[in-house]
């Protein structure tokens, strides 16, 4: 195997000229390296609203009231700790960083009593929807070189509050851990044309990989658009993603979602005078939160010249990881802000859906995404997860406790890459993991 001693110039620039060189505990919360003065001011204001706890209304703190009446978290940063990912559990109970999407077989509107997402908290005088307990089943898997690893599979128990009525007997719940936010503005700036160029929904090239776009209804434009955010690519852009998170995670209404999303049984039980009119967050503050997200920079790759990292880069491509985790994309010329335009980026994602097999399936359909299909998560910044968030919980529900465990959970379209990884020598495995941890 041949490789150059030194990385190509600029290879560490994961976000082009937006890249920041910070590998410390605040690596995920840095503004774009090329941020303008006006966007820096908006970034600072947006950061304040992202991190501060919202309070119940009415309150003397009118700029931050409107929490609930049903909610899951009090702030954006409660789940996205330091702009990173959440942790799935706290002993046997689930943490704030893990939420649950709800569904009923054959329907796309959620549970008729509890709605589309479980609200574990509520305002005074209002009943929460319930809680979830979790336990893990361990199983051992082997490698060709006789090494073994232990994988854990979560089992969830819904403890529903019958105050609003009993949920559907076939209720499904999909755990969703909060994702890291680095570089999301750059991902938003990748054109639909670029994303669709990598799609192959019918696997016409016969390589076993069938990246599929998800098309969703955009509540702001009132149009069917390409999804790119969320675990199942169910949000079109950062405005709709942010508005959905405000509403479903915190019960905060916005210009995009100006009314609470209650089920009919909840409307009968909740005092509707608690509901704000106009929306809890106005467009000016909302746009600053969106600008904050758009201007979060991806950290640079580390140790790009390390021989082990170089070998791992080659192996990443050789065993098929890069078929879905596409290393390089380019942003378009019509990005929301100038700093994001025409940037060569290295997010290691195609922003498309892939069938990952029954082992990771939750049965919940989301627009065109089936219960076993997931959007390829970006890998930039993954090696700093432990430094920033103090854990290495990966995949949509945080079941994987390491990058290796995440690889071993790959099924469906990821099966071949998992098999190829399992057959690597211990030294080659170390090189591959060193490369991924350098991102």
Segments (PLM) and residue ranges:
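Periplasmic c-type cytochrome electron-transfer domains
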Residues: 5-439
């Amino acid at each position: 195997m041949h490789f150059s001693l030194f990385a190509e110039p600029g290879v560490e620039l994961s976000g082009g000229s937006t890249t920041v060189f910070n590998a410390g505990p605040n690596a995920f919360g840095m503004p774009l390296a090329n941020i303008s003065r006006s966007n820096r001011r908006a970034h600072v204001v947006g950061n304040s609203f992202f991190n501060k706890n919202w309070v119940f209304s009415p309150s003397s703190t009118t700029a931050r009231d409107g929490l609930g009446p049903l909610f899951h978290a009090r702030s954006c940063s409660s789940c996205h700790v330091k702009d990173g990912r959440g942790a799935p559990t706290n002993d046997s109970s689930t943490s704030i960083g893990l939420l649950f999407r709800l569904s009923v077989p054959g329907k796309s509107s959620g549970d008729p009593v509890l709605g589309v997402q479980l609200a574990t908290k509520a305002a005074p005088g209002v009943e929460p929807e319930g809680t979830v307990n979790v336990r893990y089943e361990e199983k051992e898997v082997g490698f060709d070189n006789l090494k073994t690893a232990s994988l854990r599979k979560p089992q969830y128990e819904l403890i529903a509050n019958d105050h609003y009525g009993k949920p559907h007997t076939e209720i499904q719940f999909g755990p969703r851990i909060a994702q890291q936010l680095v570089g999301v503005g750059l991902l938003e700036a990748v054109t639909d044309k670029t994303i669709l160029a990598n799609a192959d929904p019918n696997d016409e090239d016969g390589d076993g990989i069938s990246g599929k776009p998800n098309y969703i209804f955009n509540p702001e434009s009132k149009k069917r658009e390409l999804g790119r955010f969320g675990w199942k690519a169910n949000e079109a852009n950062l405005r709709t993603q942010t508005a959905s998170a405000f509403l479903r995670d915190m019960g905060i209404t916005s210009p995009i979602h100006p009314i609470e999303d209650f089920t009919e049984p909840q409307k009968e039980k909740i005092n509707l005078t608690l509901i704000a009119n106009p929306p809890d967050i106005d467009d000016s503050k909302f746009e600053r939160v969106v600008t904050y997200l758009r201007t979060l920079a991806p950290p640079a790759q580390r140790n790009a010249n390390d021989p082990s990292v170089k070998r791992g880069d080659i192996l990443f491509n050789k065993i098929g990881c890069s078929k879905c985790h596409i290393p390089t994309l380019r942003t378009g010329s019509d990005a929301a802000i100038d700093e994001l335009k025409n940037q060569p980026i290295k997010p290691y994602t195609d922003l498309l859906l892939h069938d990952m097999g029954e082992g990771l399936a939750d049965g919940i359909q989301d627009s065109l995404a089936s219960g076993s299909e997931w959007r390829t998560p970006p890998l930039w910044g993954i090696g700093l997860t432990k430094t920033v968030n103090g854990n290495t919980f990966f995949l949509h529900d945080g079941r994987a406790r390491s990058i290796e465990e995440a690889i071993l959970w790959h099924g469906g379209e990821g099966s071949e890459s998992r098999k190829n990884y399992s057959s690597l020598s211990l030294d080659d495995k170390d090189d591959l993991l060193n490369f991924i941890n350098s991102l």
